[in-house]
Every structure is written in structure tokens, then in C-alpha cells.
Amino acid sequence: MQKIRKGDKVVMLAGKDKGRTGEVVQVMPKEDRAVVRGVNVVKRHQRQTQTQEAGIINKEAPVHLSNIAIVDKDGKPTRVGFKVVDGKKVRVAKRSGEVIDG
């Protein structure tokens, strides 16, 4: 079970976008990376294809999972733990102890 999943609201802990929040769009567990909406936006030079024009586009680049943390109810970053509730393994916010919906 992953600590950070698609749809989670996260905050950047390091890098040029430190402190900014966004929603996880994609998680790549094999590379330990995630794509976060509106964070780590880079410019890509797009080659022309039959469907797309050439030009410079803005795109979210993946960030390492160690540089992001889930946002707790009070808006501050929290670590994630696991607990068994009613026979199911669920994610729990270490800061508040609340179950993270997922």
C-alpha cells in the first residue's frame, strides 16, 4: 500500500516550489516519483506532429516522493502511518491521528 496516492493533496517540502500545494495527478512507485498539478512546471520544446503544432509548452515534471508530504486537516504537512480498522489497512495522519480518506 502506498503512502501517497493519486488525488491526495500534498505540499512541497523542498525545491523551487517549496511550500506550494497541489493535487497528485500520477504516482510512479518504481521511480519513487509523483506528478503534482501546478508544481514543478517546466517548459518543453514540442516537435510538430500530425495532431499537434510545434512550440514551447508548460508541463508538470515528476518530483521525488521524499520532497512532498500529505496536507493534514489544519493545512500543515504530515507523515503517513498505517493502522488496521475493522480488518482493513488504512492510512493514518501521524500529526492528528485521523484516518486519511482514499
UniProtKB/Swiss-Prot annotation:
GO MF entries: rRNA binding; structural constituent of ribosome
GO BP annotations, alphabetical order: translation
Name the job this protein performs. Answer: One of two assembly initiator proteins, it binds directly to the 5'-end of the 23S rRNA, where it nucleates assembly of the 50S subunit.
Q: Which GO terms describe its cellular component?
A: ribonucleoprotein complex; ribosome
Q: How does it assemble?
A: Part of the 50S ribosomal subunit.
**Lineage start:** Bacteria, Pseudomonadati, Pseudomonadota, Alphaproteobacteria, Hyphomicrobiales
Family membership noted in the UniProt record: Belongs to the universal ribosomal protein uL24 family.
Q: Which SMART domains match?
A: KOW
Matching entries from InterPro entries are given as: KOW (IPR005824), Rib_uL2_dom2 (IPR014722), Ribosomal_uL24 (IPR003256), Ribosomal_uL24_KOW (IPR041988), Translation_prot_SH3-like_sf (IPR008991)
Q: Among its keywords, does the record have Signal?
A: no
Stated name of the protein: Large ribosomal subunit protein uL24
Q: Which domain of life is it from?
A: Bacteria
User: Which keywords describe this protein according to UniProt?
Assistant: Ribonucleoprotein, Ribosomal protein, RNA-binding, rRNA-binding
Instruction: Write the gene name.
Output: rplX
